[in-house]
Amino acid sequence: MLFLSDLDRTLMDSNGTITEEDVNSIYQWTQKHSFGFVTGRDHAFCMELASKYQFSCEYMITDNGANAYYKDQNVYSSLIDLDDGIQMCKEILKYNLDLFYTDEVGNRYYPVSSYGKERLHSFEKKQPSLGRFSNIDILEYINSRDLGLAKLSMYVENDLDLLLNQFRDLFKNYEVMATSKDYIEITKKGTNKWEAFCHLPVEDAIFIGDGENDLCILKNLKNTYVMDHAPESLKVYGVCVKSVAQAIDIESRKENV
């Protein structure tokens, strides 16, 4: 049986830390079963996290469903066209927002040509969990790519709901979503975690999540858990728990009945 977990505010706190209780539960689970991540985070971040905690993590859905991996092999991609990506970046820059793109190995690209290096350094200090950024400008980098883009990310300090609606009107042919209280991300139309799941070599799984972008999986899988801090609208789609460890414990007890 496969157990899939969302990362931010489900398995991992805002500092990127996983509790000892959750870590030990995952170790016990993976002695007999499979485990994986389902997240808006990029693949490089997920690989580093799995390595840090020494998780056996064969399945990964990353970038809000833009990519799916099985045993480190990319089995599915849903990517933004490069020309469209460049045009969207130019529109977003008019709003003076902190925009960035993360490549396949975890390098991040910022509008350094438009905003300057001082603003980049200020942003790095403001969001240290993102790590270091390249000195190459985001538009210059996208112009040099051959593959499409998994997602565009924006850090939004104020007026998130207002900006979310404006970008949804502006980019009607793309998925525009708030992935946290201060982030808006854009992916290709039709991209979601459930669509990515359907391309993994597995028919069923247990899933735990806490966000609106988890709803597509919560609605489609039978065996689901929702974190107790999740919006009330999500709680009807799974068993409410306080931690990943609690969900794994419930599943383990089912096996022993």
Regions found by a protein language model. Name each.
Residues 1, 180-257:
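Mg2+-dependent phosphoryl-transfer enzymes with acidic/Ser/Thr/Gly-rich catalytic loops
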Residues 1-16, 218:
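Asp-based phosphoryl-transfer active-site loop
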Residues 3-5, 60-61, 207:
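Residue-level marker for buried hydrophobic side chains located in beta-strands
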Residues 18-117:
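Active-site phosphate-binding/coordination module
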Residues 32-36, 56-58, 150-151, 203-205, ...:
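Short active-site oxyanion
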Residues 53-56, 64, 170-172, 220-221, ...:
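Short, structured coil segments at secondary-structure junctions
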Residues 57-63, 120-121, 175-178, 224-228:
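Short hydrophobic/aromatic-enriched beta-strand-loop microsegments
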Residues 95-97, 102-217:
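Conserved acidic, metal-coordinating active-site core of Asp-based
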